[in-house]
Regions:
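Phosphate/dinucleotide-binding and metal-coordinating scaffold of catalytic cores
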Residues: 1-327
């Protein structure tokens, strides 16, 4: 299988960057990537998008199971759960057994409009960017109450989630990381926001506390995106935060610290991983290393002050600019 990779961080248009090859053996997928010769000749960027992908022609292979740069474009637990449920519904409708889904299925199952970062994917160079299902566009702000109800019903009984409810959730939620119920929402001005809904497993109003912590971070001088809080039920509040990888309709390339440091899920102090790895990366490839290292220190102190223990390398990341990466 060949997946054609496009980028839209070097110009206003989507440019063919290279091909991700997916080979399946014994039910496992194996990956390799090859840059487009034309893209290599024309690109003005000299910053690696993945520690395992260098600026030369020919196939390149990941040192781990997969390339981190493409893993960042995949959904995490919540989005994968929705895509799995969609496959079971489709299999039931077609009277067949559900397919075993692989990473490439999840990668291509994300709706293109709301995909994280500035990479886009096709399986046909003359076709549409995937996923292109018109039924799964980001819903308007006015549907938040309905989306919260759909996510609650899914958590209670995923078999309850029929095709109608699933479309309400999968269209905005499949592109996002993390395990909590969430969705992309389009604000009246056209900007994209992330809505994080209350969960049946919450022991307190998590959304309200996230908003409090977010506002405290801003008061302490940390760089945080715009946020809001809405309440639609007795279960708790919905916390909303503006997407930082969009500037209007322009896509901004984002990569997790996990990817750029060449780490894998579960990396911790036990294997030598630390904030110093992020500092070293910023010193070598950062556009504003001094400023970003100060920002990182503020995050460390703030997380300690508010007892934030959910602090791992997927919760830190970098934005690509023409001058380098920024925290």
């Amino acid at each position: 299988m060949e997946i054609y990779v496009y980028e839209c961080f070097s110009s206003s248009e989507s440019r063919f960057m290279g091909t991700l090859f997916v080979d399946t053996a014994k039910r496992n997928e194996h990956y390799s990537f090859e840059y487009s010769d034309e893209w290599l000749k024309e690109t003005k960027f000299s910053y690696q998008l993945d520690p395992d992908i260098f600026f030369y022609s020919g196939r390149q292979f990941p040192s781990k199971n997969e390339f981190g740069v493409f893993a960042d474009s995949c959904p995490d637990r919540w989005g994968r759960a929705l895509i799995n449920r969609r496959e079971r519904i489709q299999a039931d409708r077609e009277k067949r057994k559900p397919r075993e889904l692989h990473t490439s299925d999840y990668l291509l199952g994300v709706y293109d409009e709301t995909r994280m970062g500035a990479l886009r994917f096709k399986t046909d160079k003359d076709g549409e960017f995937l996923s292109n299902d018109s039924d799964v566009a980001a819903p308007p702000w006015t549907t938040l109450r309905t989306l919260e109800e759909a996510s609650r019903n899914y958590e209670i009984d995923e078999d309850f989630l029929n095709d109608k409810w699933l479309k309400q959730l999968i269209k905005p939620g499949s592109s996002l990381g993390g395990a909590r119920p969430k969705a992309n929402i389009e604000a009246p001005d056209g900007s994209l926001w992330i809505a994080k809904f209350p969960s049946k497993n919450d022991e307190c109003n998590i959304g309200a506390w996230e908003k409090v912590t977010h506002d405290l971070a801003k008061l302490c001088g940390l760089s945080v995106p715009e946020s809001k809080l809405e309440t639609f039920s007795k279960l708790g509040s919905t916390f909303l935060v503006k997407r930082f990888d969009r500037d209007g309709k322009k896509r901004i390339h984002f990569s997790s610290a996990m990817t750029m440091l060449g780490k894998t899920d579960g990396a911790s102090a036990d294997d030598g991983s630390s904030y110093l790895d992020i500092v070293s990366f910023l010193k070598s490839y950062g556009a504003n290393p001094k400023q970003d290292i100060v920002e990182l220190w503020k995050r460390i102190v703030f997380n300690m002050a508010v007892n934030n223990t959910d602090d791992h390398l997927r919760n830190h990341g970098f934005i690509l600019t023409k001058s380098g990466w920024v925290l």
